[in-house]
């Protein structure tokens, strides 16, 4: 029996985590939940179904309402509540299904309490990869990736000699704008950006997918997650989104993980690891998926991946700054303050101006993040 903490329970990944939990009875217990969105009704339904020991929320109105409805459950508010959810003594696996850097203190606290980390929050590794992975090694904690690309790489790399690995390949659908010309990209609408051809995701990650910043973030995440200093990490466009990641070995062999474009597959793999359980949905059918296409990323139209590689080379505070500035720029786009085609040029200008510093502590990382967001609001 695995005892789970779930951060981000009402978001897209969180809801699918609970779908997997429902489908494999007598395997999991939901000990704690945290939901920092505004979907109060969904959270109430989850509490009634799973009866967690502890629940954490951000909104004070939600906090007060839950305390009235569930007097037998410990209801907590704010960042301290999030940390408590992640580190509850009965928990054996902390699932971080939320996006954004807000979950970072809880991730670090859970690692220090030696909880297995199931991670769908790429910002934790992009902004604080050195800190998070160092703490994980020191505490003997395993970080299991939920992101479909990193989960695919994890499965391909399991049990392999790192000296035999030549290249890691992440796949990208290309996002909702992949077929638009450079001229057309100058005038895309919010509706076009949010109309992803394959994945159903939240607005922030959908915008990141459209700029391919998401793939840049994933390259940085893969570097910290797998710790393969000398191994090349690349991304390729794969419109069908059936191959999620590939590992090329020194002898020319390539291993890949293939499944339909559903997050249920990597979520189930992580939750049941190191065991495997029957899939809760239909798997990959070669006869109905006979076309697999791969294309290089057009860096002229989508320069963000090249920018992310530069960020990775500089290390230090650069990843944190890159992540924070991008998130603020995306929110400005969603609010109608800037156009889509301004996001990456503004991000590149901010990165050019940032003076890299060492980021060893949580406090330093959060300070750089705040600086990045403030500067992105002003540019």
Curated annotation (Swiss-Prot):
Pfam families: DXP_redisom_C (PF08436), DXP_reductoisom (PF02670), DXPR_C (PF13288)
Residues involved in 1-deoxy-D-xylulose 5-phosphate binding: 122, 148-149, 173, 196, 209, 214-215, 218
Gene Ontology MF terms in the entry: 1-deoxy-D-xylulose-5-phosphate reductoisomerase activity; manganese ion binding; NADPH binding
EC identifiers of the protein: 1.1.1.267
UniProt-annotated binding residues for NADPH: 10-13, 38-39, 121, 123, 202
Cofactor: Mg(2+); Mn(2+)
EC category: oxidoreductase
Pathway: Isoprenoid biosynthesis; isopentenyl diphosphate biosynthesis via DXP pathway; isopentenyl diphosphate from 1-deoxy-D-xylulose 5-phosphate: step 1/6
Binding-site positions, Mn(2+): 147, 149, 218
Membrane is among the record's keywords: no
Residue runs in coiled coils: none
Alphabetical GO biological process terms: isopentenyl diphosphate biosynthetic process, methylerythritol 4-phosphate pathway involved in terpenoid biosynthetic process
Catalytic activity from the UniProt record: 2-C-methyl-D-erythritol 4-phosphate + NADP(+) = 1-deoxy-D-xylulose 5-phosphate + NADPH + H(+)
Keywords, alphabetical: Isoprene biosynthesis, Manganese, Metal-binding, NADP, Oxidoreductase
Family: Belongs to the DXR family.
Protein's job: Catalyzes the NADPH-dependent rearrangement and reduction of 1-deoxy-D-xylulose-5-phosphate (DXP) to 2-C-methyl-D-erythritol 4-phosphate (MEP).
NCBIfam families documented for this protein: Dxr (TIGR00243)
Name of this chain's protein: 1-deoxy-D-xylulose 5-phosphate reductoisomerase
